[in-house]
Every structure is written in structure tokens, then in C-alpha cells.
């Protein structure tokens, strides 16, 4: 049947799909709007599947809270341009709200949660991939339960690429808690304390330090026991750089973070810091290769 402009406009407003896609959907379904929506979804899912092997290393990190929990999550896109899109930001906020209302512990459980539309988070992300034209994925999330007598705080950097959630045993002034979250965002500690650093990591770092020492002319000819102490000192310094309680507190450098926490009579229970794309290897292509790929060459 002939498809008129009004039907195309109506379908486009409902689905946010492209004009030509809406026209094809209506032609394929004899002008039936509901069937056309299904047709677009089915074809959208097919398109989204083709994008599943792309690398999504951009995106947004977000920490959010309600009366009972704090959630911190990272949702990835392929480009920074999409990550700044208002619809993408709203999608992440919706996902955060669904996670806050849940007790999900794993990524699999999170993706299976139902949204207000009745679709799962995974289905919503697949639909977003089809509509936006980029691979969109929930990479990770952490839920922290609030408990009476404890202090939770969160920090979202203005660039939307770094978020932090902290949970303290004991009562901490909100300004101090927020400043500590900003410290974590800026200094990116990997562990709460040196005691939490895995033995394998320590051994690997010590091996690297030994190899570096062999190339350092200042250390040549040192007695073995003296050299060993120097190397242990270097290891301790390196480990303290990635241990939160051993870092100098950026807000007041007269304290280490651990000393500051002791002065406030609180203990850090949970520390979660997400930075968009950390640990993801980005694919870099030159312009000619990108054009060739799009042309199927």
C-alpha cells in the first residue's frame, strides 16, 4: 500500500528511527504502525548484533544514591560525541535508578533487571545500540548498602568520566567525606591499604625494581645488604602511591589519608572508583583504513 508522510512522521516519533527506515517498515507491514514498530525492532536488533564486536571505550561513569543504597556504574559508547548526548545521559540515569531499586550483585543479574518499559536493561541497551548507531553497553556497576551509623558519599567529576563512591564505618562530616571522594578521584588509588595489595603484584613490582637497579649506575657496587634495603624502600614508595591510606591527603598534606581517617575516628569500608575506558584497549585506525572498512574493502 502507499505510505503517506503522516504515518512516517508518527512512526518516527514513536521509535526515533530514521525516516527511510520508517518508510521501509511501513511498506513491509502494509502501513500497520504496530507491526512496523516490531519490524524496526527486529531489524534494529540485527543491526545492533553486527556492532557487538566493536570496541566501546568512551562513555559515562555515574555515582548516584537514594535513601538505602549508592550505585556506581559505567556505561560505554564508541565515541565521546555520543557520550555527551542528552538521550545517552538520560539512559544512564534510568539504568542507575533500576539498579538502585534492586539487589543485583553481578553484571548478568543487572542486565536482566526490568526497566519501566518492561524491557530488561540488556534489551534497552541493544535497542539503544540500534537507534544510536554505536555499541552501547553496561560495563560494570557496584551497589553499596547504607547502614545506620555509617557515612556514604559520592563524587562525579564534571567531565562525567570519573566517579567515586565511598562508605565509612562511623560518622564523618559531609564536607570531609566529599573531599576524600575528590582525593580518590584525583589520585586514583588502586587499593585501600598496602595490606590489600596481592602478593603477586608486589613480587612483580619488586622484580621490575631489581631490573631497573641493574641499569642505575648510582647503585652499582653497593654492598648486597645495602642494595636490598634500597630496593625495599623503592618498593614501599611505589606501593604507597597506589594505597589510599598511605597517600598524602591532597586537601591537607600534613596528613596521610590514613592519619586523617584516624583523627576523625572512622574506618573506610568500601572504595569504588570508576574511570571510563580504563583497561579497555582502544582500536586506532587511520582515515584511509576507516573509509576502506566502510566501503567493504
UniProtKB/Swiss-Prot annotation:
Entries under InterPro entries matching the protein: EF-Ts_dimer_sf, Transl_elong_EFTs/EF1B, Transl_elong_EFTs/EF1B_dimer, Transl_elong_Ts_CS, UBA-like_sf
PROSITE patterns attached to this UniProt entry: EF_TS_1, EF_TS_2
Subcellular location, record wording: Cytoplasm
Keyword Cytoplasm: yes
Chain spans, region Involved in Mg(2+) ion dislocation from EF-Tu: 79-82
A Pfam family the protein falls into: EF_TS
An example molecular function term from Gene Ontology annotations: translation elongation factor activity
Key words, A-Z: Cytoplasm, Elongation factor, Protein biosynthesis
Superkingdom: Bacteria
GO cellular component: cytoplasm
SUPFAM superfamilies: Elongation factor Ts (EF-Ts), dimerisation domain, UBA-like
Function: Associates with the EF-Tu.GDP complex and induces the exchange of GDP to GTP. It remains bound to the aminoacyl-tRNA.EF-Tu.GTP complex up to the GTP hydrolysis stage on the ribosome.
Matching PANTHER family: ELONGATION FACTOR TS, ELONGATION FACTOR TS, MITOCHONDRIAL
Family classification: Belongs to the EF-Ts family.
Protein name, per record: Elongation factor Ts
Source organism of this protein record: Mesoplasma florum (strain ATCC 33453 / NBRC 100688 / NCTC 11704 / L1)
Lineage: Bacteria, Bacillati, Mycoplasmatota, Mollicutes, Entomoplasmatales
